[in-house]
């Protein structure tokens, strides 16, 4: 829904160059444009905790427009709260936690079987979704799907952005998405940049994070199971997006991009000249101690690793790093 921006007087008054987001009434009208065309077996929701409010609104709309569709919520929100999410969104049919590459196929299969069955008893539903588990909450049976990690992240195909080229109402939402900045003041997502971007796309170079900071939830992209894609694989994807979509910024929304110094240095050698020649810059997320690159401390004197990985990232075209520092509020720390 965020891809459908409205450019009207309200957007102009608020100086929203890419338009404002839809109101709840406008969102329902837009969703109806989909449900009037197709009777969906499966409707999947996804997002982080910041999307909970909108997911609840969208789910209420879907209950009116597509009451018999199998409705599952996945991604970071479902991974963080698991079954507890069902207390907030009881109209769901289940949740899918962790990574979705494999389990989405199982969910789609189950949805088709369930929709094609005239009457689905609790025992029948349990058999259909097996070996995934089920749980009963307030008298309703829900399915709890658990995703897994593909053995080789490099073997996965690149995201097929072209499927967003045209929706059922012949609306090109891909261009709206690419023309809306991922990060920066215009993005309205608590990020800030010293530069602007005209055409941007996001992707991930790694999943999870090997660290276990108590203040950080890393479940959106792999939890503590850290895995990376190779520099060569990243370069191929980067070139593909520049050549096909003409992007000038690529955002790696990793939980922690900078874990591997070796990968960063290899990436620098591979892409530094190419990014400069093709006018592409990129950004990502990392830890503050990785940016500092402290090797050790002897007699109160800090010794840094050489070369600094952030310098290597800069040489490779990185111009934005988002850090998730622990709260400076004593009350929050307590």
What are these regions (language model features)?
Residues 2-153, 157:
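Glycine-rich beta-alpha loop elements in corrinoid/cobalamin-binding modules
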Residues 154-334:
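Radical SAM [4Fe-4S] cluster-binding motif and immediate context
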């Amino acid at each position: 829904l965020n891809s459908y921006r409205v450019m009207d007087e309200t957007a102009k008054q608020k100086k929203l160059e890419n338009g404002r987001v839809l109101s709840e009434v406008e969102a329902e009208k837009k969703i109806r444009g989909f449900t009037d065309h197709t009777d969906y077996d499966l409707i999947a929701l996804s997002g982080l905790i910041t999307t909970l409010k909108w997911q609840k609104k969208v789910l209420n709309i879907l209950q009116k427009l597509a009451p018999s569709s199998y409705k599952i919520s996945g991604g970071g929100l479902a991974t963080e709260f698991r079954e507890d999410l069902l207390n907030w969104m009881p109209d769901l049919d289940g949740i899918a936690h962790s990574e979705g590459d494999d389990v989405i196929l199982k969910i789609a299969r189950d949805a088709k079987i369930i929709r094609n069955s005239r009457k689905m008893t609790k025992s029948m539903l349990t058999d259909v979704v097996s070996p995934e588990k089920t749980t009963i909450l307030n008298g309703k049976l829900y399915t709890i799907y658990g995703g897994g990690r593909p053995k080789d992240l490099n073997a996965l195909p690149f995201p097929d952005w072209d499927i967003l080229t045209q929706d059922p109402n012949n609306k090109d939402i891909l261009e709206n998405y690419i023309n809306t900045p991922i990060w920066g003041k215009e993005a309205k997502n608590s990020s800030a940049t010293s530069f602007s971007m005209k055409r941007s796309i996001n992707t991930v170079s790694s999943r999870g994070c090997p660290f276990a900071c108590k203040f950080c939830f890393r479940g959106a992209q792999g939890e503590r199971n850290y895995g990376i894609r190779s520099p060569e694989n990243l370069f191929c994807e980067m070139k593909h997006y520049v050549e096909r979509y003409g992007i000038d910024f690529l955002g790696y929304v990793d939980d922690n991009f900078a874990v591997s110094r070796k990968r960063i240095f290899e990436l620098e050698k591979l892409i530094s000249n190419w990014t400069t020649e093709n006018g592409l810059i990129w950004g990502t997320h990392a830890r503050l101690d990785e940016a500092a690159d402290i090797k050790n401390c002897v007699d109160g004197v800090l010794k840094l690793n050489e070369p600094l990985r952030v310098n290597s990232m800069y040489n490779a075209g990185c111009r934005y790093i988002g850090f998730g520092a622990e709260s400076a509020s004593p009350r929050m720390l307590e």
